Amino acid sequence: HTYRVAELCELITRDLKLDEYETDVAWLTGMLHDVGRFEQIKRYNTFNDAQSVDHANFGADLLFKEGLIDTYVDGFHDDKYGVIVENAIRNHSAFRIDERLDEYTVMFCNILRDADKVDIFRVNVDTPAEDIYNVTTEELKNSQVSPEVMAAFDERHAVLRSCKKTAVDHVAGHIALTFELVYPISLQIAKERGYLDKMMAFESDNEVTGKQFEEIRAKLNEYVASVRPL
């Protein structure tokens, strides 16, 4: 995941025609964005932020408060771009980016957030949902999408973790991340690699859920076609 996110950061920056140093900085945010995960599993034996710590802030603290960044890049701790990397990592999994950040820093945050989301789509396609969400096949195939989650497709935004109540809410919630992609190239990559179609092809044994996914497919396809023309 780390290497793929770094690669996607580079692809996005090149599409934005940023310079080589900016591209390297964006690549570095991808390489370091989940550094908190390693210490999280070591200390708490879980990747679940709700049961341990926010891995994004934890990783940023390890790198920039405890000095771990110095093992990766010399003299980067107090550098202008060091601050940008710290903020990008700190905000990469937040529901919304810190509003106090300047526009230039927000750009790097968005590059990393887009790259992370696109590879999360890949993980959802390549890995059994039962393993990702720690649910049984029966729960996944028989549960319904909660009203709050369905509302996100009407309102075109991501789903708060607290709104996900059922097993299938997690599937729909990850699909809804599409609404948060900032750069057209990010959506183009996700579409061309087949991630969106494969996620939306989820099949349920519950008739109500089947109809809900028909609605999800219609609304997401409409969004992709009209809001983010490829």
Language model region names:
Residues K17-L28, I69-R90, T105-I111:
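Acidic/histidine metal-binding catalytic segments
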Residues I41, T71-V73, Q188:
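Short, solvent-exposed secondary-structure capping/transition elements
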Residues Y44-D54, V73-H77:
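Short coil/turn segments at secondary-structure boundaries
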Residues R4-I12, V53-L68:
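An active-site-proximal "capping" alpha-helix that borders the catalytic cofactor pocket
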Residues H1, D24-W27, H55, G59, ...:
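Catalytic-loop motifs flanking and including active-site residues across diverse enzymes
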Residues T23-N48, G59, L63, Y81, ...:
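His-Asp-centered metal-binding catalytic motifs of divalent-metal-dependent phosphohydrolases/nucleases
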Residues Y3, E7, L11-T23, L32, ...:
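Divalent metal-dependent phosphate-bond-processing catalytic cores, especially two-metal-ion Mg2+/Mn2+ enzymes
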